[in-house]
Amino acid sequence: MSTSVSIATSSPVLTMNPIITEHDFRFPRRPSAWPGAAIHNAPTQRTXNSNRIPNSRDASASFKEHKTDMATTYSLARQGLGGSALFPFLQNGLADSDRSIDRMQQDDPLATQVWKFFARTKHQLPSQHRMENLTWRMMALNIRRHKEEQQQRQDEADARRKKNMDAGSRAFRLGRPMMQSSPSGIAQLRKSSENNLAQPDAMNLDDFIFSDNSGSPINFASPEGDKMVDDRSGSSMASAIPIKSRKEPSLQNFVPQSVPVQPAHQATQGSEFNYVNRHLRKTSIDDRRTRKRPANFSPQVPAVNSTAAQNDLDLDSELHDYSLDQPNQAGIPQQSNGSNVPFNIDTFMENDSMVNNGNFQQNFSFSPSTSPMIPHGPFSGMYHNSSVPSASMSNNNNNSDFYSPPASAYPSNVSTPHPVPEQEGFYFGSQDARTQRPQGFQQSIGSMLSQQFMYGGSNGNSGSTMFSAPGTASESMSAYSTAPSSFGHIDPSQVFQNEQAVTSPTIQMPQDNMFSFGADSDDEDNNAFADRNVSMQKDMSSSLDESGAMGWDASLPGQFSTQAARFPGGPTRKQVMIGGTTTDFVDNNGDWESNGLERSQSQSFRGGNLRRQHPKLPRNASTPVHFGGQQNGFEQLAQSMQSSPAGDGNGTMSGFSSVAPSRPSSPPMSKQGSTTNLQAAAGNGNDGNAPTTCTNCFTQTTPLWRRNPEGQPLCNACGLFLKLHGVVRPLSLKTDVIKKRNRGSGTNVPVGGSSTRSKKTASTLNSRKNSTLSMSTATANSTKPNSSNPTPRVTTPPATSQPPSSKDVDSPVSGTTSGANTAGSTPNSHFGGPGPSSGAVGGKGVVPIAAAPPKTSPGPGASSMSMQRPATASSKRQRRHSKSIGGDVPVSMDIDSPDSTSSIDGPRPFGSSAGLSSLPGGMSASSFNLNQRPSTLGSATGMISMSGGQTSSLIGSSAGPQEWEWLTMSL
């Protein structure tokens, strides 16, 4: 047994000694393998002894020797294995393990160790030399700063000790008090400032990179405690001014008024500068301290609802400061069960006139002085949107209930607004005043959304009296409650979107606010301070029919909606949609969502800033805008819907009447999608407007009116130049002569007994392409003279006879007309009659717009007027997209689609009436049975200029569906 042990212990040495390279470095080498080992002869001795047979004594000796060898191995492993052989940078790692961290920090700081690490292992790093350089600089700076701080502290301590000793010995010798030799206060102040400058910078790189560095600048930023005591002891007996540290400001200091003022300046109570004699030292202007005492507002608004001291205004000193900026609402407000107003509004006045105006009360917002609980936003959820009787609002029992006069948004300078009450609650989420787009989500009457308080119980009187909701005497309703809710993390503005947006793609009207009833100057206040405007939301849009209250699907036949009737093809495009009365905004910036106080149903089609100059007209919640007195012809949109009340049957067009209908209905449109119904757009004589003028070159003579992107009229030259080149046509290119191309007018076939060749005319009746939305009925081209109403004979080119085709679907046939009364598809052929002849205006002549001596000429190709043939079609040689319209007579705007080349049966409506009261040749519209009412309107009056100078109003009324066709103006 002993032999085996001896062999086992000695055989590894025998196998390892001859060849050193065979050693496995995973295991420690025997001591004899290392050069310079303590025992060199042990292997040879063991080798010689191994030849003889060992006995028990040899076995015990071998165990002893083995124990000695193991001790030597451990000592060598500590020195060699952890040394420079394998890990050179950890050479002193095991040897220094018994040393403390502080000692290691002094001898070998962490920055030095880091530099050593990066310096020795830089061949393994991506940025080798840069890392070594960085760590070297860190180490050098840290060590240098550390040494300088130690030296400075040592020098200061020595100097201080020496100075105290000298001063004490001198005072003892001379018998004088010690304070006489102390430095003055200014000297001490200078010295303290120098000491502060000499202190190290707190920006220690090691702190941010190596957080475990025990030598952080916190240890060196200020002198140590005992040295600070020495400083104080040295200056405690000084006769100088003591420099006291500034006191910590108290946390909350609030003005206990209901006036929203800034918090008062921090009162030092005279303790900071007691060494100064008490006199007024006005060294600076305190902007936070108001000079005047805040006015005693009649309704003192207590920030808290306390029953112990109901009017003690010191209670709201516990509230935090508030901000005028609207805070985000924390979570969804709680839904309460009652339907009463949560606050007794009338608490400080007996007979307040505002109490009975419940509609107005429900829309204002107020902000107490120091209450952060009331957000600076709409109170549509807090004040319930039902018509609250004044009895429930006039309870004077709770003296500390909230009351505030209505906030003032932009007051309407045109008329007193009349907000319309609504029976349903609305919630308008937290909004930025610059983008006022409320989330109009409706809810039932009994469930109003209330705000959340940060304190208080779930009910108004169940929790603490502080911050509980002041309610009515009968029912305490929690407007501010913090009942536990599983939906507290939900933002209602993100969840409850506009509920009509999914089912009904209605036209989103501009944002209506409380005072948004029709002033043209309402938009002037928008751009002043966009983020400071208090635009109060009202719970109901003033556009009753236009706000998309009813969902509709245009594809379903049974869906009733005014929007579906007006726009059968779906929602309109974001451009000037002139159909019915609705002409949405074309603003300069192209943004329809105007954040100011806009109108909803007025919808002025404004271009540029011309609208600023118009006179103000009074409006209320139900009347649409009246366009009287506007200076730009294109801003005269449809004053009323085209299906006006039947009282217009006497011949008075509702567009020219002084009374605009309050709830107009809208006609169905053609499927081509109406662009605009600019009724009387190019100039209304009764309204005192000038003829259509180009906004660029100011001409009134052009073969075709165009529009710029803002919707303002341009002549053909300016509009075409803008379209082709993208820039405004310079005025240097303006010429007074319109060059005409000599184009043939086709075969001349006598129409109505007229066989003479038609010529170009300059009359306002046959003006080609007058796209300023004139009515342009070609009734003046009738070729039958009349004794009572003589007109010159006008011959027209042939109009190819063509039966009504399937293209009649673009404008349905009026039910009151017979098949014999057909007319062309362009405005020059609106009216058909049983007269013996018809003046068909055809050809491709280019004529000026302005009035000129009448000449016989063919009108544009598509304008054929048939009054005696059963099916009269317009000429096929018409020019698409540029249909002629007679004169400066803007009455209705028709869409002439490229497909509508054939005649379309039925009279064309004019204004709100579709009838034809008097035909120019003295012919009465026998099929209409209308009262004839001649008028003497000239060409600039917006009516039809007859060739003989006598005009006749083409106004009437007819039963049955109207036929509508709108003319687009080509750009």
From Swiss-Prot:
Residues 39-61, 146-169, 262-307, 390-416, 587-691, 742-918 are annotated as: Disordered. It holds the Pfam family GATA. Residues 146-159 have a biased composition (Basic and acidic residues). Residues 42-59, 262-274, 297-307, 597-606, 632-645, 744-794, 863-875 have a biased composition (Polar residues). Gene3D superfamilies: Erythroid Transcription Factor GATA-1, subunit A (3.30.50.10). Residues 832-845 have a biased composition (Gly residues). Residues 390-400, 654-663, 680-691, 796-826, 892-918 have a biased composition (Low complexity). Major nitrogen regulatory protein. Positively acting regulatory gene of nitrogen metabolite repression. This is Nitrogen regulatory protein areA. It comes from Fusarium fujikuroi. The gene is AREA.
